[in-house]
């Protein structure tokens, strides 16, 4: 009753009961299946574990991105954004020099913040001027007057040199209203402490400036001229300044008049989007009825920050990064008589923080998104008025429309370090800025 069996250890053949053999073979098959099933389950576990980790990572990234606001669409979707070298230039611009940097002759080092106004047939240009360092107590608000559209300029004159101990008055903005010329200038004590805005009105008979005192406090420094809103008040863009810090957040701000009373302005500081750091929020605006767009300077990245108000500047969305690159410098903005919105600064693809070339971004008529950029001037400017160099800064623009032209004042450091600037002027025919749909 015995059958041969295999002795696997010694290679010998013996006998084994057939039922026992069947039992062993069956159990051996079960073990193999169990091992295969275990391996399969282990593989599935490892795969599931890897997929779970990957999914968790994706969800974490999506969650973090969800916390970041989408770029504000101030640049029109689908419009081509070119590099600086490929941007078209405006060919028929007239250039003039308002004040040449000439320390050897006049002792002035710092110059910045051109302001412009046309008043009773004359062109006024103001700026902050200092024989010492920038943002020190020796700074003065000065101006010059041209009677031929900016080709030649009269003597340097003073709006306010600061008549209190430790008081400095610097650059500001003009405002023409009901036949009178007003000026609003940033001022401070010491080195950028207690920053505020002071108002002045030109006395036509004496050619001196009447002082109307402090009209806005809590750091407000105006950067561009007031614009009338739909509610009858005027809105003036600027920022809330203080002693500079590379890590500080100095937000964009606006001041709102009490009707035509320019002796009192309500300050509104614009909130800042979460995560924004190193902001020096010098700002500009354009006004579309009750809707106001504020475009301001960033510090961490070369991108325009944009905020929006739907109630004539009383409440704002936070200043947040837009989809338009812009150098880290003060912009100028507004609406042309054509209905086009404009932004003067340096806006070009991949240009970083370079303050050249000086550009103007334009929208199509009655649109609130820019879609075209022109170069006003580049660094090399040989044979034409103004300083020329391979590398220089063309910054801090101020713009106003008058008699078919857009007048743009700006600083030019001529390749010198810091704001050792000349004040220059570009006069652009409005017909050169028309963007066809």
Task: Locate each region found by the language model.
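Short hydrophobic alpha-helical segments enriched in small aliphatic residues
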Residues: 10-11
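Bacterial N-terminal signal peptides that target proteins for export
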Residues: 34-51
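Bacterial N-terminal signal peptides
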Residues: 51-60
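Beta-rich carbohydrate-recognition and catalytic domains
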Residues: 67-109, 117-167, 176-328, 335-390, ...
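Eukaryotic scaffold repeat domains enriched in small/polar residues
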Residues: 285, 399-400
